[in-house]
Amino acid sequence: MPGITREEVAHLARLARLELKGEELDHFAGQLDDIIGAVARVSEVADQDVPPTSHPLPLTNVMRADEVRPSLTPAQALSGAPAQEQQRFKVPQILGED
Amino acid sequence: MTVIDLESYEDALATYDPVMGLEVHVELGTKTKMFCGCSTELKQDANSQTCPVCLGLPGALPVVNEIGVESAIKIGLALNCEIAEWCRFARKNYFYPDMPKNFQTSQYDEPIAFDGYLDVQLEDGEIFRVQIERAHMEEDTGKSTHVGGATGRIHGASHSLLDYNRAGIPLIEIVTKPIEGAGARAPEVAKAYVAELRELIKALGVSEARMEMGQMRCDVNLSLRPHGREAFGTRSETKNVNSLRSVERAARFEIQHRGVALDLETGGTIVQETRHFHEEDGSTTAGRIKDNAEDYRYFPEPDLVPVAPARDWVEELRKGLPELPRLRRARLKEEWGVSEHDMQSILNAGAVDLIVATTEVGAPADQARKWWMGELARNANETGRALDELGVTPAPVPAALRFRPGAPPFRLSASAAGFPGPWSRRRSSRRCGSAAAARSPPSTTASGVCPVPACRPRASCRRP
């Protein structure tokens, strides 16, 4: 199985907006390799006749009528926010985007 | 803003074929959000329409809105698409705070509708077939306000404020296949397509599709391919182009801009990027470098079960589809006996449905048309409003026209309909409570709304 490369870790880190040092890239490459190796063992038991699944129950079409339900109050909605301003969630400057 | 050199439109087209892709997002007119029961009504009160589901709180479970699915199927059918027998939602992961879940629930490789087309009519009457790649269900994002920057843009902002009232409102994203062969008419095709799609969405009754209110938004993807080459160039994506005129301008601008960029590049490739459209001058500027699809790390949404629309439901919805707008327009043009040019004016004025409604309450078509396309259309145009925002409804028009079967045709004017004569030239007063109005109060409509277009209703307009 191909190992996770340093470059792939650096790419993932960029997507997650994490700044990693050189030695951390190597460290996490090894760790991610181990994790992927562990998950890959599933393929050993799941043969061609087992379709990939995203849900444990064989359900389809669970739908909701288009009826309004009460929302939280703004105070309730914001109660878990680390910071707020003008009844809005306050977040740090968004870097690297425009 | 930096000044960008533009190649002349003709020069760019002499070397390249434009290849376009259009992505249109339609906000559905459902009462509730796509995955929770929060209201979709537009409210100024920030974060007043959120719940654990649309805030992405741990343990909250989304359930899909049935009308959202039904609307998606209707749109798919009207676009001549196949409707998936089985499809799933997917998480689109990205690092941006406009979704509190840190992902957008969307569809990826299993859209509910795919492989369709929409025939659009160009100004000279030619029909251009736009192939549809897919229409899929997803949800809208929250609204960010950037604080501390000079212009309210992200650049230079110290922090951002998030209102999640809009987060989770149902969206249908409609994606075309690459539109090729339009050549110099590419911008016109883009505009005609978005216009036709808007009419279709309105006819289906799934959204009001008001572009100026963000209920319908268009991304214009464009690449240029040197004549005779097979491969597409690297595309640019101009986001959130929000009027028909802007769709045309953005496409035109990008053809000229891409032309310059390609000429400068020896290898003929330019970076895939997101561009922002500027309403003021019709230009676009570079935004972020786009992540590739794989960078969104799409995976099937484990909190939602698959959607498998029963075939009899799909067929029932197919039977209920309205007459296609293009065919309806052709029929009405025939019935009303108007020229292509006049029909275009009626369309541009947004008067089709009003005229139809007016004939349905008893007015002859030609008088109904003159009623709406005369002073009312001019007034709407001058005051920058839609015809149906003037407070005039079709119901009382026949009476106002003093229409009697067999009566000799009469000359239509606003004063003939009992309106104070000079109203259309008294825009500065902004209401009809003038001396003329006091002497001869305008007839109020059934709803009690003053029918005078320029009127900001005051008590004096509503005398019994």
From Swiss-Prot, chain A:
Its EC number is 6.3.5.-. The keyword Nucleotide-binding applies. Keywords: ATP-binding, Ligase, Nucleotide-binding, Protein biosynthesis. SUPFAM superfamilies: Glu-tRNAGln amidotransferase C subunit. GO terms for molecular function: asparaginyl-tRNA synthase (glutamine-hydrolyzing) activity; ATP binding; glutaminyl-tRNA synthase (glutamine-hydrolyzing) activity. It is an enzyme of class 6 (ligase). It catalyses: L-glutamyl-tRNA(Gln) + L-glutamine + ATP + H2O = L-glutaminyl-tRNA(Gln) + L-glutamate + ADP + phosphate + H(+); L-aspartyl-tRNA(Asn) + L-glutamine + ATP + H2O = L-asparaginyl-tRNA(Asn) + L-glutamate + ADP + phosphate + 2 H(+). The keyword GTP-binding does not apply. Allows the formation of correctly charged Asn-tRNA(Asn) or Gln-tRNA(Gln) through the transamidation of misacylated Asp-tRNA(Asn) or Glu-tRNA(Gln) in organisms which lack either or both of asparaginyl-tRNA or glutaminyl-tRNA synthetases. The reaction takes place in the presence of glutamine and ATP through an activated phospho-Asp-tRNA(Asn) or phospho-Glu-tRNA(Gln). Belongs to the GatC family. This is Aspartyl/glutamyl-tRNA(Asn/Gln) amidotransferase subunit C.
